[in-house]
């Protein structure tokens, strides 16, 4: 009887996510030559594409209101230039309002910030698109000697606006 009870307990534990027992994803992660620290209340999630080097979730008012934060680094000679990526990101929105592009220098590194609101056309390039109205993009392109790093946060406008300062702090911290 003791063996059956032990087996049952093991089987039940296997059904639960073992991360509930203290295993927490690392707070620091490296993309290209930069080591980033995820904001404390953001969640590390498994990347959903081989093109993504890291993926986070910024919380919203509820789970359906969270924003997706993705990191890309394509390696030397790949990924396109800053202008091409800014244009592509802006092109992912219909009914755009308030598009902003700003270049800043952090410790001799150029960072191009992109911000746009409107209807985000979610989906893989060349594939079907799903319109997501009342959305916002906050993006950053970090210029690097080893090729640019691209960071893009998309989600409901209120969530992205609320996470903007944490996003900028996360992007700029490895440059200081």
Regions found by a protein language model. Name each.
Residues 21-29:
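Cleaved targeting-peptide boundary
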């Amino acid at each position: 009887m003791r063996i059956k009870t032990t087996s049952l307990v093991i089987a039940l534990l296997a059904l639960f996510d073992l991360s509930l027992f203290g295993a927490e994803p690392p707070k620091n992660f490296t993309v290209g030559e930069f080591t980033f620290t995820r904001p404390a209340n953001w969640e590390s999630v498994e990347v959903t594409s081989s093109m993504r080097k890291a993926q986070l979730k910024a919380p919203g008012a509820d789970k359906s209101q969270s924003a997706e934060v993705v990191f890309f680094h394509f390696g030397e000679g790949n990924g396109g230039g800053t202008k091409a990526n800014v244009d592509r990101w802006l092109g992912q929105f219909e009914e755009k309002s308030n598009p902003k592009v700003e270049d800043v220098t952090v410790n001799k590194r150029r960072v191009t910030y992109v911000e746009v609101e409107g209807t985000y056309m979610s989906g893989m390039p060349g594939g079907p698109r799903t319109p997501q109205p009342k959305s916002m993009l906050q993006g950053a392109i970090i210029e690097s000697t080893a090729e640019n790093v691209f960071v893009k946060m998309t989600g409901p406008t209120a969530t992205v606006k609320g996470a903007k300062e944490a996003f900028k702090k996360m992007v700029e911290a490895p440059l200081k």
